[in-house]
Amino acid sequence: MPEGPEIRRAADNLEAAIKGKPLTDVWFAFAQLKPYESQLTGQLVTRIETRGKALLTHFSNGLTLYSHNQLYGVWRVIDTGEIPQTTRILRVRLQTADKTILLYSASDIEMLTAEQLTTHPFLQRVGPDVLDARLTPEEVKARLLSPRFCNRQFSGLLLDQAFLAGLGNYLRVEILWQVGLTGQHKAKDLNEAQLNALSHALLDIPRLSYTTRGQADENKHHGALFRFKVFHRDGEACERCGGIIEKTTLSSRPFYWCPHCQK
């Protein structure tokens, strides 16, 4: 499943295609959304927001399209009039004069009013987004030390969208390597220096992945993501200590780590 940086970059691409342009045609696959087709035609997409792995497409009439890609959903941008060659099932089409955005295969799609946004179950449950520039390391540290999260092992906590939205497995792996910790640790057992390092890494690593994606610099990884330090590098030497990176399973997900410098 894509993690926060990939979801945000997808939202950027969608915004670049249709933001601020009148919608010339709107189509939904689901019957409960059909009444909104006429309501949205002629409206503008004002912004596309991410909340972890969910997308919120805001329209000029105050409505918001909520979509969660889950495992199989994918958004695509095409030239208006183009007919994509795909076996995926189309769920949403938002068309402007020159560009059209398409959502395939997703099933978690709703139209929400401003009031419903404040009470939506997923949006109520999800924590602050790691790519939200307003979120600070101090606020992350406070969440780590809160009664709700301080006694949970990082192996599970860093996959929990209620803690911080947008984290996922590769980010969990890279963050814990960056701070030299294993997944069995809990925030309540860390010293001040470790807490500060982790609070910064929980924001710095996702933001680095987002900002360097596809750029030709030392953090590039196969043109897709920043260069991984340990993820999918089992059997290779750790660049920090020279130890051999190992692979195991934590919280039912593959976990990569260096036993020599992650304690």
From Swiss-Prot:
Classification via Pfam families: Fapy_DNA_glyco, H2TH, zf-FPG_IleRS
SMART domains registered for this protein in UniProt: Fapy_DNA_glyco, H2TH
Zinc finger (FPG-type): 229-263
Residues noted as binding DNA in the record, renumbered to the chain: 70, 125, 169
Similarity remark: Belongs to the FPG family.
Cofactor binding mode and count: Binds 1 zinc ion per subunit.
Known role: Involved in base excision repair of DNA damaged by oxidation or by mutagenic agents. Acts as a DNA glycosylase that recognizes and removes damaged bases. Has a preference for oxidized pyrimidines, such as thymine glycol, 5,6-dihydrouracil and 5,6-dihydrothymine. Has AP (apurinic/apyrimidinic) lyase activity and introduces nicks in the DNA strand. Cleaves the DNA backbone by beta-delta elimination to generate a single-strand break at the site of the removed base with both 3'- and 5'-phosphates.
Reaction(s) this enzyme catalyzes, per UniProt: 2'-deoxyribonucleotide-(2'-deoxyribose 5'-phosphate)-2'-deoxyribonucleotide-DNA = a 3'-end 2'-deoxyribonucleotide-(2,3-dehydro-2,3-deoxyribose 5'-phosphate)-DNA + a 5'-end 5'-phospho-2'-deoxyribonucleoside-DNA + H(+)
Cofactor(s) annotated in UniProt: Zn(2+)
Descriptive protein name: Endonuclease 8
MF annotations from Gene Ontology: class I DNA-(apurinic or apyrimidinic site) endonuclease activity; damaged DNA binding; oxidized pyrimidine nucleobase lesion DNA N-glycosylase activity; zinc ion binding
Active site annotation, chain numbering: 2-3, 53, 253
Record HAMAP family: Endonuclease_8
GO biological process, any: base-excision repair
Keywords, in A-Z order: DNA damage, DNA repair, DNA-binding, Glycosidase, Hydrolase, Lyase, Metal-binding, Multifunctional enzyme, Zinc, Zinc-finger
Matching InterPro entries: DNA_glyclase/AP_lyase_DNA-bd, DNA_glyclase_Znf_dom_DNA_BS, EcNei-like_N, Endonuclease-VIII, FPG_cat, MutM-like_N-ter, Ribosomal_uS13-like_H2TH, Znf_DNA_glyclase/AP_lyase
EC number(s) stated in the UniProt entry for this protein: 3.2.2.-, 4.2.99.18
